[in-house]
Amino acid sequence: MREPAFWHRPPSLLSRLLLPFGAVYGEVTAARMQKVGIETGVPVLCVGNYHLGGAGKTPTTLALVQLLRDLGEHPVVLSRGYGGRLRGPILVDAKRHSAADVGDEPLMMARTAPVVVARERTDGAALARSQGASVIVMDDGFQNPALVKDASLIVIDSRRGVGNGCVFPAGPLRAPLPLQVARTDVMIIVGDGQAADAVAAQIAARGGPVLRARLAPDETSLERLKGRRVLAFAGIGDPARFFATLRASGVEIAEQRAFPDHHPFTADELASLADSARRGGLTLVTTEKDLARIGPDAASLGSDLVALAVTLVVEEEARLRRFLLERINQARTKQFAR
């Protein structure tokens, strides 16, 4: 879905008219969040966000996986598999499954990490354990109470923050902000904007680490784009951030097209992109997540298609590493005491 523009402006007449619906939605979500979850037997780290749409959870999840591997752990990612038809639990095979099977984000992550998809997170956790998981990393699921979380890491975009601060449909929030803040252990702010500073101050006041991070484009991909004019397209939570990343890296965008998050590209849309690129002498560039969704149909876009990979770089990585060690050790001590 495309996010309404009023979600990211000061409260308007429309958002005020929708506040009663937001109050009901918020009450239901808040009651659900306060249910007691099930212990999995291994530490569970959740990467989530406060609002609907993208914030950088997937690159954060992959960065967390790498940090855990550096600490000697065997992390397995657990995802609901949004956009996929398979309910799971299933271990994603990047060579066998498609985005239509398991969702675009799990398919993309499965190229570098073991990923389990399951609508029922308890079943997914059991499969992850059977795959030798020493730590489960939940990609999304902050508002889901199914599993006991040993740490919740919230990702927030520095330019968008929490929008107008209202609960869906009056705003982008999935649940009332105070409840979500109270359950946050770490906040990771992506980018150098200031829109998230107010909520970050609340986390810091509670003693939680607030870490700055940035998305670093893959140098090999950028080298392929050097000196070229491009047609950039993306169907992700925040296409504008992708376009801004390209421009900040010195890429000349001659044309850009934004699609809704998880957008299933049609043959006509792909043909239109290829035709526009050919007529303008442009190189097509998109995200890894979009490429996972396009799948074999990418051949219709030509050999010049570039999928820009990005990596999350955390400024105070040592601080995050210490936090992870502490929470993992606490979780294991708690499990041993039982």
UniProtKB/Swiss-Prot annotation:
Matches recorded under HAMAP family: LpxK
Task performed by this protein: Transfers the gamma-phosphate of ATP to the 4'-position of a tetraacyldisaccharide 1-phosphate intermediate (termed DS-1-P) to form tetraacyldisaccharide 1,4'-bis-phosphate (lipid IVA).
EC number assigned by the record: 2.7.1.130
GO cellular component terms, semicolon-separated: plasma membrane
Binding of ATP, residues: 51-58
GO MF terms, alphabetically ordered: ATP binding; tetraacyldisaccharide 4'-kinase activity
Lipid biosynthesis among keywords: yes
Similarity-based family: Belongs to the LpxK family.
A Pfam family it matches: LpxK
Reactions listed under catalytic activity: a lipid A disaccharide + ATP = a lipid IVA + ADP + H(+)
Protein name, as recorded: Tetraacyldisaccharide 4'-kinase
PANTHER family, sorted: TETRAACYLDISACCHARIDE 4'-KINASE, TETRAACYLDISACCHARIDE 4'-KINASE, MITOCHONDRIAL-RELATED
